[in-house]
């Protein structure tokens, strides 16, 4: 006698037109991802261990749903049943439907195999036109007891609009402007470094304004690049056809992995700024489906982040920690969390909060600077021992061919015709940081007749004056060899000298100053700011404040499969406090003295297999200090994305103090 054991579960699943999907009587919003069955070595052949790994990664991203283009391995459905992940089970049909001879057999086999999996909440007939209408009645026929809802993915069909890759304002009489339940079964296409978590919150927040929003599925879980034995064992994603994942082919975590995890965390924190008035309380929102927040817990840690000028205490050291009292609030409610500020709170540099679910698993962590960049700089400089005392005061000299600021250890030379750095010598070694400042996203013209040098008690000074977007850039070299830069930008409505008001881009993607520095000289970077992943304007969530380090790499997201090192080295880094560019010959450190600076470190290479460029344009220089950066997107252009993806615009009124870009450079060897 043959027998088979099958584990089943009991739950109710209901669909109500113009209302939503209800699981056990509670309205469900799916936070989902599309997943292909894939392994590097086995292609479409996977294992129970891989299914477990993938399901756990889905849960770690705070997702609760999965869809694919065909019935998955049963062991993956078993994992979904076990972990509480809901599933949209689809009859294969990628844009071409089965005929009426083969199709009925496949519908019957799929439903009879999968019917007892409680994770399955919706059936799907084909994909993007790949359905046969004659098969539709068969889903209810074979799912005779539960009669789960059936959809045509990408279509507005059967009272559920599943439109693929909607724009932010989709659409006329549909989605947020319509009167049908909507659930995009593909959106935020994560090709290369695009999509995924970039811009996710804009779309999600907009859709959540409509009670008929039932969730959606990001495309796609992992890059599909099988090992090609016929091509020497390379991993091949077929150029741009399959590098679509938020994780790599071996499940390497990309930046979007963490961005999604943060934006879909079931516990959300309202915007928080640590000031002198902070008393340890802040607002939290419960975005769980069922769980009251009193079943969860949260901890806090106070960390120190020292500068390279002071090594008295290891960066990242925890000087205080404890528990946060969470409010007893039901799903959908907002309440106040609180903790008692430890006596050492103001001695720290970063507040870290971490939330744990009812099973004790970490669901998200958030970080907040206890001091903003200028406060941090002043505080740390006041505590820094007075090392490397100067023998002679710094001097400023000007000739017809050069402007020179010179101290005992560092000499900085400027071109008097352009106002740009032409040479830096430190300890007898040339530091190849030069050819700047060059304006990014704006126009400025150096005015040599208005510029001047002077010697002061605070060091050697060179004041470079400009027409256009910049008013002045003051360089000051201290006796100890520290180089200060104070730039005043956009403080006048008319740039003068023929510029009038046409001295900035009408759409601001990048705005700031850039310099050149040879990439070959750089071996790594250590910095304080958001990290460890690079950011885009619409993908800052998922990065945290701290001191980070990464060695140089040339990873091309979704393509460098033979040497896939994450986080990527090149790109934009948010909220820089300080950064050390490591080099065997010419390391140096930059300190930010104002807030919100994006640090552009070299320009990532475009994927060779791309159909078109995948990233917005970077500044022309190698190293940039920016007050605004561009967003990234896929499929739809930027103007069809959400508000946090849009380029900035500049308005200047008489009396504005302008924008400041204040830095300090330590070139001392």
Protein language model features and the residues they cover:
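Exposed beta-strand and adjacent loop surfaces of beta-rich binding modules
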Residues: 279, 295-299, 350, 421, ...
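Extracellular/periplasmic ectodomains of large secreted or surface enzymes and adhesion receptors
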Residues: 237-238, 244, 250-251, 255-259, ...
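Extracellular interdomain linker/stem segments of modular secreted and single-pass surface proteins
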Residues: 10-17, 372-376, 520
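N-terminal carbohydrate-binding accessory modules
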Residues: 1-58, 78
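Beta-strand/loop-rich accessory regions of lumenal/periplasmic or secreted enzymes
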Residues: 344-346, 375-669
């Amino acid at each position: 006698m043959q027998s088979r054991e099958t584990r089943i579960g009991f739950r109710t699943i209901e669909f109500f037109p113009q209302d939503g999907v209800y699981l056990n009587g509670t309205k469900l919003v799916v936070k989902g991802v599309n997943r292909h069955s894939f392994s590097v070595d086995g292609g479409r052949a996977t294992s129970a261990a891989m299914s477990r790994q993938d399901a756990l990664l889905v849960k770690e991203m705070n997702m609760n749903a999965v869809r694919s283009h065909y019935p998955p391995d049963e062991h993956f459905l078993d994992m979904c049943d076990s972990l509480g992940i809901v599933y949209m089970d689809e009859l294969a049909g990628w844009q071409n439907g089965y005929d009426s001879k083969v199709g009925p057999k496949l519908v019957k086999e799929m439903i009879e195999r999968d019917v007892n999996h409680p994770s399955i909440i919706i059936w799907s007939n084909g994909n993007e036109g790949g359905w046969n209408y004659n098969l539709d009645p068969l889903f209810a026929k074979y799912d005779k007891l539960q009669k789960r809802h059936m959809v045509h993915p990408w279509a507005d069909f059967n009272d559920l609009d599943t439109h693929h890759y909607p724009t932010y304002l989709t659409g006329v009489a549909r989605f947020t402007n319509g009167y049908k339940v909507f659930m995009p079964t593909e959106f935020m296409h994560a090709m290369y470094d695009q999509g995924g978590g970039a811009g996710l919150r804009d779309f999600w927040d907009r859709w959540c304004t409509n009670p008929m929003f039932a969730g959606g599925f990001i495309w796609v879980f992992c890059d599909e690049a099988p090992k090609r034995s016929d091509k020497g064992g390379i991993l091949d994603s077929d150029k741009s056809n399959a590098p679509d994942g938020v994780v790599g082919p071996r499940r390497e975590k990309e930046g979007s992995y963490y961005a999604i995890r943060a934006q879909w965390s079931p516990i959300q924190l309202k915007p928080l700024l640590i000031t002198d008035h902070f008393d340890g309380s802040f607002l939290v929102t419960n975005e769980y489906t069922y769980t009251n927040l009193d079943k969860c817990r949260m901890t806090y840690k106070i960390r120190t982040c020292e500068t390279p000028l002071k090594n008295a205490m290891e960066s990242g050291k925890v000087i205080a920690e404890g528990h946060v009292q969470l409010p007893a609030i039901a799903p959908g409610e907002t309440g106040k969390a609180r903790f008692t500020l430890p006596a050492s709170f103001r001695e720290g540099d970063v507040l870290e909060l971490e939330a744990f679910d009812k099973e004790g698993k970490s669901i998200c962590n958030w970080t907040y600077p206890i001091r903003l960049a200028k406060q941090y700089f002043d505080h740390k400089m006041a505590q820094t021992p007075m090392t490397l005392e100067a023998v002679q005061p710094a001097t400023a000299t000007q000739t017809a061919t050069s402007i020179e600021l010179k101290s005992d250890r560092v000499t900085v030379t400027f071109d008097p015709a352009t106002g740009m750095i032409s040479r830096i010598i430190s300890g007898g070694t040339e530091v190849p940081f030069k050819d700047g400042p060059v304006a990014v996203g704006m126009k400025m013209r150096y005015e040599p007749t208005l510029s001047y040098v002077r010697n002061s008690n605070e060091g050697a000074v060179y004041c470079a004056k400009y027409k256009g977007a910049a008013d002045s850039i003051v360089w000051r070299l201290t006796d100890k060899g520290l180089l200060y830069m104070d730039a005043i930008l956009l403080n006048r409505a008319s740039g003068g000298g023929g510029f009038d008001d046409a001295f900035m881009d009408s759409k601001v993607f990048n705005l700031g100053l850039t310099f050149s520095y040879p990439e070959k000289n750089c071996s790594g970077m250590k910095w304080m700011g958001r990290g460890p992943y690079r950011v885009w304007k619409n993908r800052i969530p998922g990065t945290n404040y701290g001191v980070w380090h990464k060695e140089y790499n040339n990873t091309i997201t979704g393509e460098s499969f033979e040497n896939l090192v994450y986080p990527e080295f090149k790109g934009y880094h948010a909220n820089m406090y300080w950064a050390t560019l490591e080099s065997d010959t010419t390391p140096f450190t930059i300190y930010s003295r104002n807030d919100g600076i994006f640090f552009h470190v070299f320009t990532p290479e475009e994927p060779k297999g791309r159909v078109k460029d995948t990233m917005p344009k970077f500044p022309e220089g190698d190293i940039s200090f920016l007050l605004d950066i561009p967003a990234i997107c896929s499929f739809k252009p930027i103007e069809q994305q959400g508000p946090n993806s849009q380029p900035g615009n500049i308005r200047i009124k008489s009396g504005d103090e302008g924008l400041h870009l204040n830095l300090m450079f330590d070139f001392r060897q």
